Amino acid sequence: MAAAAEESGWRRVGFVGAGRMAEAIAQGLIQAGKVEAEHVLASAPSDRNLCRFRAMGCQTTHSNLEVLHSCSLVFFATKPHILPAVLVEVAPAVTAEHILVSVAAGVSLSTLEKLLPPMARVLRVSPNLPCIVQEGAMVMARGCCAGSYEAQLLRSLLEACGQCEEVPEAQVDVHTGLSGSGVAFVCAFSEALAEGAIKMGMPSGLAHRIAAQTLLGTAKVLLQKGQHPAQLRTDVCTPGGTTIYGLHVLEQGGLRATAMSAVEAATCRARELSRNPSPVVAQVPSVLQALQGEGALAHREHSSVARS
């Protein structure tokens, strides 16, 4: 792993923010052997989330700047409204050697680049929680200074956490609504399926296990056979059988329209966040300009030494 890291041009992976999404990505990378746990450094204001990183064998700190000084590949996994202030804080430590990845929903590449030095190589990723079991569904988009090398490196790493595809940035917010928020939508549906079985007399634990396995198996069939869901649905239905009766009730309840509206609402919220970034963005014109100039250059040598 160490040799591969040297060849790829990075040695340590950093996480600014240590919440569930950061943990999911870190755990996926570690379990897949993409990075050793001791080469992961995570920062957070308190120990509440950092303790989970320590349990994985990772290094932790309360200093965001330490992450930038120690790691050339850094994931920013803070809450969206906090991220702009964090970027202003760490901007002096950013060099041309860094690859910076944001997983914050609704924070556009233009906002990220506005808060970082001009040469910063920035990418935006929309992950989802199943990354923690290496079954995530992710998309990524590049900033203006990130090229094919950065995109290929990030994709090769994130594929350890599941499926990762590069898309135009306009589709990232749609992915947030479909897959990021979709995890909760699918859980709600799985819960409802199980509760239907419980109502009909099946024990609760068994009902929830079977519901989850049904979703898992169905997803595998769709992916492995490349079928459209409508085709598989038709294959399951028999004239006058149980399935068509159940589907009729789902149609009466507006399942399709409700699911479509849920994705639309979540996507619109992500776009709203993109259009209305934190007030911090408008509060840093002259200060940020100074940070992007001599401040970043002054830290370049220090960053190189810290990573060696």
Swiss-Prot record:
Catalytic reaction equation(s): L-proline + NADP(+) = (S)-1-pyrroline-5-carboxylate + NADPH + 2 H(+); L-proline + NAD(+) = (S)-1-pyrroline-5-carboxylate + NADH + 2 H(+)
InterPro entries cross-referenced by the UniProt entry: 6-PGluconate_DH-like_C_sf, NAD(P)-bd_dom_sf, P5C_Rdtase_cat_N, P5CR-like_CS, P5CR_dimer, Pyrroline-COOH_reductase
Transmembrane segments: none
Pathway, per record: Amino-acid biosynthesis; L-proline biosynthesis; L-proline from L-glutamate 5-semialdehyde: step 1/1
UniProt entry tagged with the keyword Chloroplast: no
Subcellular localization, as worded in the UniProt entry: Cytoplasm
Subunit structure: Homodecamer; composed of 5 homodimers.
Protein family according to the UniProt entry: Belongs to the pyrroline-5-carboxylate reductase family.
The protein's name: Pyrroline-5-carboxylate reductase 3
Organism, as annotated: Bos taurus (Bovine)
Underlying gene: PYCR3
